[in-house]
Amino acid sequence: MQSLFAPDTVVKGEDRDGDGDPDVIEIRLEVMELNGKSPDGPAVVPEYEIGPGITPGFWVFAPKTRGMTTVNFESLVANRIIRLPSPVIRIEQGDEVRIILENSHYLPHTIHFHGLDHPFKTPDGDGNDGVPLFSEHPVMPGAARTYRVQPRHAGTMFYHCHVQPHAHILMGLQGMLVVEENRPNNWVQTFNIGAGRVRSPSVAVLEGYAREYDLHYLEIDTELNNRIQRFNDPRLVSRAIHRGYNITQREPDYFVLNGRSFPYTLRESMVVVRPGQKNLIRVLNGGAEGLALHFHGHKPTVTHRDGVAVALGARVQRDVFWIASAQRIDLELNTTNDGLNAYGEGAWLLHDHREQAVTSNGIGPGGDISMVIYENFLGPRGLPQTVGGVQSLAPYFSPAYYAGEMPVFIGMGGHDLLDPDRPRSGGSKTWLFWSGVCLLALLVLIWPARWRRAR
């Protein structure tokens, strides 16, 4: 499988301290649009679904790509590295890192390294804080800027655009940035595309944890995001975003974890564990509102806040964590079944306990629902086992459900139970119709992803 990276997307240079890993790193990012207005028709391009049939507009930072932004010539679907959220970036404490923003977008942007140790100016006198007017001019369309960091402190940080931040951050120009503790032979995983499970944890993480997960939360107000679907003219887009949108009247419609809403979170962002393990979970609230993160069946412990270790005597263990906008917390999830850390194996929900956050445009279940799930509770193709079998998940993979066109209890054995529009006769025909819809959704769910995306 090709990486889709350009040859210079990540360049790892010399090992200056002789400890077996590179210490000079160069990373290139672009700015991409998702679900923007097509000049050729009503479709949005490149297409990126947060849920079944749900395609708000986004701007994202993406690794510098090669080839097409879509899956193939015949498809409108975005390729796998251009997506929400902007990629998690990992670097090592003490490394000399150059992050180059190549502005491939039609509006000016910057990168601000929120919480990351960095100088206000580079040695050459260039602005390095990403804040227009005070630090530097923004990076104009077609231009590039090199940001330089050499972090002295490890932790979970945040990067985002600082041009008109009330709009650009919430459009998706934000990502998690992790500084790993320095260790010998520590080849960190530079990008975690789509966040979720870290495939190659650092040496320091593996000293204390079996697995590591990145969780990036964001809420979406389509009154902002979908403005880019109205125009192709950058002047009109800029006016609509920067002058037409009033953030003081913000009302989110959708809530995403790692760029997806339920049920797509079940395919990408479950926290999969085994009994008796310690797992590291890094959480970023990238939204404009607070997040009440609730774990069913477990009580994790906060070990770090905003990249700073919490003293052992001050660490808090609970099942709901209030996380402010832009805040990061590191959690230790201990799956020892002792009635405190964990209650035993299962498929335990993980979600924001603000009730609107478990809906998609007011329809539930949706939003940022995910799971802490034990491997023994995984069913076919890595989805959770359910009381009704995998087919009971099928309705939620249908756009018709989130358009409000399917009965509320259809996935729960109730079919059209309590549906006021249900005919008092001919019930078998109604049941047969919705069964057919669910069967079609199930086939789409289990069919190979490549077939689904090639159009």
Label each PLM-derived region with a short phrase:
Residues 18-24, 90-94, 140-142, 152, ...:
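Extracellular/periplasmic catalytic domains that process cell-envelope and extracellular macromolecules
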